[in-house]
Amino acid sequence: MAAVAVAVREESRSEMKTELSPRPGAAGRELTQEEKLQLRKEKKQQKKKRKEEKGADQEIGSAVSAAQRQDPIRELPGPGSQLGGTAGEKLPAGRSKAELRAERRAKQEAERALKQARKGEQGGVPPQACPSTAGETTSGVKRVPEHTPADDPTLLRRLLRKPDRQQVPTRKDYGSKVSLFSHLPQYSRQSSLTQYMSIPSSVIHPAMVRLGLQYSQGLISGSNARCIALLHALQQVIQDYTTPPSEELSRDLVNKLKPYISFLTQCRPMSASMCNAIKFLTKEVTGMSSSKREEEAKSELREALDRYVQEKIVLAAQAISRFASTKISDGDVILVYGCSSLVSRILQEARVEGRRFRVVVVDSRPRLEGRHMLHSLVRAGVPTSYLLIPAASYVLPEVSKVLLGAHALLANGSVMSRVGTAQLALVARAHNVPVLVCCETYKFCERVQTDAFVSNELDDPDDLQCKRGDQVALANWQSHPSLRLLNLVYDVTPPELVDLVITELGMIPCSSVPVVLRVKSSDQ
C-alpha cells in the first residue's frame, strides 16, 4: 500500500517537472506576461491534481484497513500489487473518486458474499436456506409469534423447579385459555392448593397458609386490603421466628420468607402494592445490625411494618382525601367504577363536609364489586345511582367528572386498574368529561406496560357462569372444545386518557410518575 502511494507521487512529480521545464525556444530570453500567466495556470492545475491523488490514496488506505478488520486472515496486497487488481498493476492516476468508490463498494459486496458462503459451508446450510428468526419472514416483515416464550414446556418445567425446591405446592392450570393469554396461569377455586398439604410438616407458616387461602378464594380483594393483610401476616411470622444457631437474623429471615412469598404467588399473583411492601421489609431486614439482640430486632421490624401501614396507607388516604375534596363542588355528578376503598372514603368525607353531589356507581360482572360501594354510600346518605358498564355511555352526558381508583401506576404513566377502567376513560374522553385517578405513591412501580396482554391476571373462568334460578348459563362449558372463557382481572389505561392523578404528594399528571419514583429511590 505504501509503495503504491510512493510510486504515484513520484510519477506525479516527474510529470510536473517535465511540464514546468522551459520550452524549446524559451531559453535565453525573459518570459512575457502571457507566458507567466500560462505558467501559473499550469502550476495551479498540477497542485489540484496532486490534491486529488492524495485524496485517492487516503480512500484506498481506509479501504485496506476496513478489509483487514473484516477479514484479518486474508493476505494483504504486496508492494507491487493494487487493491482489486492483479500483481504488477499500478494505480491509474486518471481515476476519479466516483470510480474508486464504486470499485471499492463492489469489492466489499463480493467479500461479504464470500464470507456468507464460507459460513454456510461450515454450518452445513447454505445462506439462502438459513431459517429466519422467530417472528420474522423472508420479506423482512416481523410477525407476532404464535406461541410466547412462556408457553414453552421446557420453561414451564424450569419455573416449577423453584417451588419444588422450596417445598411449596403448585397449582395446575384450569380449563382452556384464550390464545392471547395462554402464557398467564388460570386457576379454579374448586381445586384447593392445601388439599394434599400437611400443615405440621410444612415449611409454610400457618398465618401464610390462611392468608393464601383467603387470597385464592377472593375473601380478601383490593390492593390496600391485600397489602395490609400481608403485613399483618408478616408480623406474626416475625414474632414466631427464632434465629438458628450459627446464623444471623438479617440473612436467615430473608431466606425463610422466600417460600412464603412463593406460596402466596401460587395462590394469587402478587399486586404491585404487595411487591413494594416486601421490598421494604427485605431492605429493613438486610440493614439490621448483627449486634442487636433477637427480640430487639424483631420488635423493630414489627414497628417498621406498623409504621409502613400508617404512613403509606392510612395517612396517605387522609392527604388524598383532602386534595380530592377541593375538586368536588356542589351540584356535581360523580361517576365511580367498582369498589375502591380510597374513592369511597373521599366521597364519604366530602359528604360529611357538607358538599352536595350525586354519585353514579358503574359496575360489571362477574365480581359486581360496585354493590359494596353502593351500600357504603347509601349508608352515608349520598344520593346514588347504580348501573352496569354497558349503559355508562347513556349517563355520561350528565356526569361532571369521573373518579377512579388504581391497582398500580406504571413508570410510563399508564394506570393499571380493574378491567373496564380503560373503557370508561375512553368513553369519558369522547364526552369531554375529566378523569381523575386517586392512587397512593406506594402503588407506583417501575414496570412499563402499554397493554394488558403481556402481564395480567386470569381469574376463575367458572365465575362467568350466570345462575338464574335452577338454570346455569355456560354449564359444562369445558365439554365444548371450541369454547374458551376469559375472565380478565386488570386492564391498562394510557396516560392520554387520564387528566389528573391525586396522590398524597399532591395533584400531578401521569408524566410525573418517573419523577416520584426517582425521588422515592433516592430517599431510600
From Swiss-Prot:
Keyword Phosphoprotein: yes
Function as written in the Swiss-Prot or TrEMBL entry: Acts as a component of the translation initiation factor 2B (eIF2B) complex, which catalyzes the exchange of GDP for GTP on eukaryotic initiation factor 2 (eIF2) gamma subunit. Its guanine nucleotide exchange factor activity is repressed when bound to eIF2 complex phosphorylated on the alpha subunit, thereby limiting the amount of methionyl-initiator methionine tRNA available to the ribosome and consequently global translation is repressed.
SUPFAM superfamilies named among the record's database cross-references: NagB/RpiA/CoA transferase-like
Compositionally biased region (Basic and acidic residues): 8-20, 31-40, 96-121
One Pfam entry name: IF-2B
Family, as annotated: Belongs to the eIF-2B alpha/beta/delta subunits family.
Subunit annotation: Component of the translation initiation factor 2B (eIF2B) complex which is a heterodecamer of two sets of five different subunits: alpha, beta, gamma, delta and epsilon. Subunits alpha, beta and delta comprise a regulatory subcomplex and subunits epsilon and gamma comprise a catalytic subcomplex. Within the complex, the hexameric regulatory complex resides at the center, with the two heterodimeric catalytic subcomplexes bound on opposite sides.
Segments of skewed composition (Basic residues): 41-51
Compositionally biased spans, kind Polar residues: 130-140
Biological source species: Mus musculus
GO cellular component: cytoplasm; cytosol; eukaryotic translation initiation factor 2B complex
Gene name of this polypeptide: Eif2b4
GO biological process: cytoplasmic translational initiation; myelination; oligodendrocyte development; ovarian follicle development; T cell receptor signaling pathway; translational initiation
Keyword Chaperone recorded: no
Modified residues (N-acetylalanine): 2
Protein name, per record: Translation initiation factor eIF2B subunit delta
Modified residues (Phosphothreonine): 86
Region (May bind the chemical integrated stress response (ISR) inhibitor ISRIB): 171-180
